[in-house]
Regions:
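Long, low-complexity, charged/polar intrinsically disordered regions in eukaryotic proteins
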Residues: 1-26
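Hydrophobic alpha-helical interaction segments
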Residues: 2, 172-298
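Short beta-edge/loop segments at beta->alpha junctions of small alpha/beta modules
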Residues: 24-115, 216-236
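Short, well-structured alpha-helical interface segments that form or flank functional binding sites
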Residues: 51, 67-70, 119, 186-190, ...
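Short coil/loop linkers at secondary-structure junctions
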Residues: 62-64, 131, 249
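Short gly/ser-rich loop at a beta-strand->alpha-helix junction or flexible surface loop bordering the NTP-binding
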Residues: 83-95, 101-167, 283
Length: 298
């Protein structure tokens, strides 16, 4: 299909929230196949920017899934669609070059997983505007294991991090721009997750910075409830330690003290197990206090 013939349709997919505001009738006057027109129109009307072969097949029960797959492959070749993963396609905005187009990768979490998930760890810190260095690594928390656990799409690594049912909670639809929402851990759960696995959050220094930056937004009772529900000594001890180190006045510190056990955990999982033991929190301080404080001040 010539590029000029698909211009009208591709203009509809530049922004999912604007799909319904566009006039779909002009597609009838373009030299576009009936199947292509029906597929794109259906998902534009639903404000969908991605779909599966099965979704498309439901529009044409008289055709085989193989025939639909061939049609979608042709549309991909024509620059209408981007192939995300097996059986899943993303609609490409007209103004974008199909060879280089890459949507905001937060939007690819749902089509890649196709089930329950949320964006977490360092990626969630980015959505909550708590980091200054964006990463080409999207971290997606899942409650069912996916193999392989990583997938690369046009230079962006998507990492699927498994959480057991006990740890899979505390997420909601969150705005990432003026038009789109994604499932992301809320602020308090983001902090809990990052304390559990600091290596997925850029290290304990990044976690400390995030807590300091959001200290006036954090719901501390919610944070405590999450820590209790998560039921991890590493979370309890790192959280209590950092709240005291950052001089954040909150009564949950006393509650965290009551929850701590006698076992020793390291402050930062990315660094060697060395440094003095802080008996108040039973933490091995393998990161210098000044390193944390200086990072917060810069």
């Amino acid at each position: 299909m010539p590029k000029k013939e698909i211009k009208s349709i591709k203009s509809h997919v530049s922004c999912p929230r604007n799909f319904k505001k566009r006039n779909l009738q002009d597609m009838k006057h373009k030299n576009i196949g009936a199947t292509e027109s029906k597929i794109l129109s259906a998902f534009i009307k639903k404000s969908r920017n991605w779909f599966t072969v099965s979704d498309a097949y439901s529009l044409f029960p008289e055709l085989s899934e193989n025939a639909i797959s061939i049609q979608l492959a042709r549309m991909t070749y024509d620059g209408l669609l981007m192939h995300i993963c097996k059986g899943t396609y993303y609609m490409i905005p007209y103004e974008q070059d199909s060879e280089t187009f890459m949507p905001d990768w937060h939007l690819l979490a749902e089509p890649l997983v196709g089930g329950e998930h949320y964006i977490g760890y360092y990626s969630a810190l980015q959505i909550h505007q708590l980091i200054t260095q964006p990463s080409l690594n999207e971290q997606i928390v899942i409650n069912k294991r996916i193999k392989p656990s990583e997938k690369a799409i046009k230079g962006v690594k998507f990492q699927f991090i498994y959480h057991n049912p006990k740890h899979f909670f505390g997420y909601k639809k969150t705005w990432i721009d003026s038009f789109n929402k994604v499932l992301c851990s809320d602020l308090e759960k983001t902090i809990i997750d990052c304390l559990y696995k600091p290596d997925y959050a850029g290290g304990i220094v990044e976690v400390a910075k995030a807590i300091c930056m959001s200290k006036d937004k954090i719901k501390y009772e919610q944070l405590l409830n999450y820590a209790v529900k998560f039921d991890s000594q590493a979370v309890v001890k790192r959280l209590g330690y950092l709240l005291e180190l950052l001089s954040i006045p909150t009564s949950i510190i006393d509650e965290l003290q009551k929850l701590r056990s006698n076992s020793i955990i390291v402050l930062d999982t990315e660094l060697p197990k060395q440094g003095k033991i802080l008996s108040r929190w039973n933490i091995q301080q393998n990161v210098d206090i000044e390193t944390i404080k200086n990072a917060i001040l810069t």
